[in-house]
Amino acid sequence: MAFRLKLVPDKTSVNFFKWGGIPTHATFALALASLIAVMTIGLNYGIDFLGGTTIRAESSENVAVSEYRSALDQIELGDVTITEVFDPGFRADQFVKQVRIQAANETEVSNALIGQVEAALQVVDPQVVFTAVETVGPKVSGELIQTAVLAAVLAVAASLLGIMAYVWLRFEWQFGFGAVVGLFTDAMITVGLFSVFQVRFDLTIVAAVLTIVGFSINDKVVVFDRVREILRRDSTTPLPELMVVALNETLSRTVMTTVTTILALVALYIWGGDVIRGFAFAMLFGSVIAVYSTIFVSAQVVLWLGVKRDWEKKTDTGPSGTQFTTSAE
């Protein structure tokens, strides 16, 4: 006997648009508030943006990262990140860890503080050898922030433009514009969350934002594809009703995908360690806001813009809409 887990019934009839554009306008207001928070409060930049000191530690003993971290907790340090370094060329008894330290108040890490760090690590691992120490001062870190932030903004902007072009070609320009509006609110609100709560913002969070964009567009394309299928077979029903049908038909898939993603992210947040916790936190919030924006932002924008109903209508140059054909060899 087979058992099937159903979080959502096969057939649902939820009217997602009974509140009109209120949820959409509320989302726009929240995105604007997030932008204002980033501009006024700012972000709690991590070592990737502010610079600091990187210490490379090698040992013949495989000491856990948690033991290194416990040893450094006794010292008054700024933001500290400890990661294991793996390389196929390492010997069987060669274990390398990288300790990255951001000094408090954005000042340069002193040699005395570096000495305290090395002494603390030698207590828990007498075999440890420090093979390299690199420091990025506060003057360089200011330039680093500008360059890194600009690169991150350009990366997100390029991904949004590419996604809009794809959806435009795959469907219609209204779908592409609606998708990009939803993706922008996803990214902006997520970044705003980090600004308001001053959670550490580093390159892993930039990666999380781009991952959220990918997760979100996947959900939107599924819904838009169902809308197009329904439009092809129904040319009389009002578009809002067809959109509700499409959202309900894909609701089970959306819920199951989101729930399984959240379960994995919760495990990463709890047991993944400090390095990946920020990524998991951003993804937990982003996976929920992505589904929300599909229904209450992207779909609503498409309704406001309207779409043509004659998907199968022939024109002088061929079928209407963007079509891709292949010929047999």
Swiss-Prot record:
GO terms for molecular function: protein-transporting ATPase activity. Disulfide bonds: none annotated. The keyword Cell membrane applies. Keywords: Cell inner membrane, Cell membrane, Membrane, Protein transport, Translocation, Transmembrane, Transmembrane helix, Transport. It is a multi-pass membrane protein. GO terms for cellular component: plasma membrane. InterPro entries: SecD/SecF_arch_bac, SecD/SecF_bac, SecD/SecF_CS, SecD_SecF_C, SecD_SecF_C_bact, SecF_bac. The chain crosses the membrane at residues 27-47, 149-169, 177-197, 204-224, 256-276, 279-299. One of its GO terms (biological process) is protein targeting. HAMAP family: SecF_B. Belongs to the SecD/SecF family. SecF subfamily. Part of the Sec protein translocase complex. Interacts with the SecYEG preprotein conducting channel. SecDF uses the proton motive force (PMF) to complete protein translocation after the ATP-dependent function of SecA. Forms a complex with SecD. Part of the essential Sec protein translocation apparatus which comprises SecA, SecYEG and auxiliary proteins SecDF-YajC and YidC. This is Protein translocase subunit SecF. The gene is secF.
